[in-house]
């Protein structure tokens, strides 16, 4: 009887534990729901009943945090598309959703129609990047400029890096740099290389030559190291404490400012003494001498911020896309063969008197252009951009209140199976036929703030792929290694690989 009593007591105790556990879980769920509902109400209460009823579906999440944890969890788990997919699953395919991110009430625009409307409306929407990003890139850069200032600086800086004449000027240097890099990486003494790291260095050398010609190796190395830390802090939580990515990014920005200011001071001092630099004007020269219609020149902090922005964008995107395009080609032998055949045909058509490729030759590389576009779509280097509503505006039939932030999810557009069938498949042939509808292909944005260096970036990528296809192969050390998606998609081993020269004719 005693044993039976003890058994019954144990059973009752176990039952009590289950009840207690269930009560705790229910309590946590209830508290979570109450806190989320309260935060949502606080954020929208001031809008009034009529405006609240017109908001898109969604939720604000927890105070201070909002959807940031869900965003970071999705991107760090290796499934970045899960973040937007959770909104679609819970609230339907409305195209826009409300949430709370980067310390602000935010609308997520995830369809071509919604993104196009926001990007083409320069009066209704201004730049709305998070304060942390503005701090890192610079308050005088494009991410924080008014429409008029952006138009003025863009007009000044876009012409020297776009258009037939400008690109022709840079083609020879790009070609020489690519050829020398491939030969060095494929030499027996190089062994395995971090392919992405080397590509970033190569593209950085190119962009520094364009913007700051004559910069010595020490300056380039100091800048390149700092940009690595800067980029890791771009999409991180803005926690300015030792050990956090944002803390290191702030230190990197200070180093960048110091190095660029030193170069700028040297240019100004030389000009004051009447010294003239040899060679053509570079971007820094143009920024120093630029005047607006009222005769106002750019201050040093404006020049430094514009340079930080351009130098970063000019090598990060090109380096990453070049790596992924090479990897995709190597993983798809049929696509590789077709792209290589196109390059061989173009080489056969070049007159014997012509020294190297011309820009017109690159215009003939139709399939290679499709490879680049498909890589841009699949990789999504710039997966999101930011705007802020200047007034109440309706998008997809829903209200975006004045002052609210808008995130334009380019990645969601590019990976939408209703826009691109089988979106995870690398298929350059999907670009055959008419050009894509406006709003469906957004690797460089759209409208007045379209990335001014897009043509230069595509030329760099194409030059590299041309030489790689004709003479080299890539063998990855860890082809199945995990991909990290922040700040940009990359293999965790930076694509550790062996580059082998396979043709002596090239």
From Swiss-Prot:
Gene Ontology MF annotations: ent-kaurenoic acid monooxygenase activity; heme binding; iron ion binding
Enzyme Commission number(s) of this protein: 1.14.14.107
Record GO biological process: gibberellin biosynthetic process; gibberellin metabolic process; pollen germination; pollen tube development; pollen tube growth
Main localisation: endoplasmic reticulum
Membrane topology qualifier: Single-pass membrane protein
GO CC annotation terms, alphabetical: endoplasmic reticulum; endoplasmic reticulum membrane
TM helices/strands, residue ranges: 11-31
Keywords, in A-Z order: Endoplasmic reticulum, Heme, Iron, Membrane, Metal-binding, Monooxygenase, Oxidoreductase, Transmembrane, Transmembrane helix
Swiss-Prot/TrEMBL catalytic activity: ent-kaur-16-en-19-oate + 3 reduced [NADPH--hemoprotein reductase] + 3 O2 = gibberellin A12 + 3 oxidized [NADPH--hemoprotein reductase] + 4 H2O + 4 H(+); ent-kaur-16-en-19-oate + reduced [NADPH--hemoprotein reductase] + O2 = ent-7alpha-hydroxykaur-16-en-19-oate + oxidized [NADPH--hemoprotein reductase] + H2O + H(+); ent-7alpha-hydroxykaur-16-en-19-oate + reduced [NADPH--hemoprotein reductase] + O2 = gibberellin A12 aldehyde + oxidized [NADPH--hemoprotein reductase] + 2 H2O + H(+); gibberellin A12 aldehyde + reduced [NADPH--hemoprotein reductase] + O2 = gibberellin A12 + oxidized [NADPH--hemoprotein reductase] + H2O + 2 H(+)
Subcellular location: Endoplasmic reticulum membrane
Record family assignment: Belongs to the cytochrome P450 family.
Cofactors demanded by this protein: heme
Pathway listed: Plant hormone biosynthesis; gibberellin biosynthesis
Major enzyme class: oxidoreductase
Reported function: Involved in gibberellin (GA) biosynthesis. Catalyzes three successive oxidations of ent-kaurenoic acid giving gibberellin 12 (GA12), a key step in GAs biosynthesis. GAs, which are involved many processes, including stem elongation, play a central role in plant development. Required for pollen germination and elongation.
Annotated InterPro entries: Cyt_P450, Cyt_P450_B, Cyt_P450_CS, Cyt_P450_sf
Binding site for heme: 451
Tissue: Expressed in roots and panicles. Expressed at low levels in vegetative shoot apices, leaf sheaths, leaf blades and stems.
Gene null: resulting phenotype: Severe dwarf phenotype without flower or seed development.
Name of the protein this chain belongs to: Ent-kaurenoic acid oxidase
